[in-house]
């Protein structure tokens, strides 16, 4: 499992709970980042994943963008491709 400072490579799609998709890496290059530099909900959720796993993360606003856009609870489909 990745740790809190691991660099992860993922594909993801993000939605607001009204079904509005606001971002996606699917169909393009995978997204890479350190888990301590993304929203807290990703830091928590992706640490529970194993390589190759796909998971849906329901992230409350206080673990997402905290009033910034997009606001409210967010839903991310995440595929963990690799980590180190």
List the model feature ranges, each with a label.
Residues 1-84:
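Cross-family detector of peptidyl-prolyl cis-trans isomerase
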């Amino acid at each position: 499992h990745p740790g809190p400072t691991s660099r992860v490579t993922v594909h993801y799609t993000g939605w607001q709970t009204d079904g509005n998709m606001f971002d996606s890496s699917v169909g393009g290059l995978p997204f890479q980042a350190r888990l301590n530099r993304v929203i807290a909900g990703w830091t928590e959720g992706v640490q529970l994943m194993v390589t190759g796993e796909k998971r849906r993360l329901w992230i409350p606003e206080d673990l997402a963008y905290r009033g910034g856009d997009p606001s409210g609870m967010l839903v991310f489909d995440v595929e963990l491709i690799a980590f180190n």
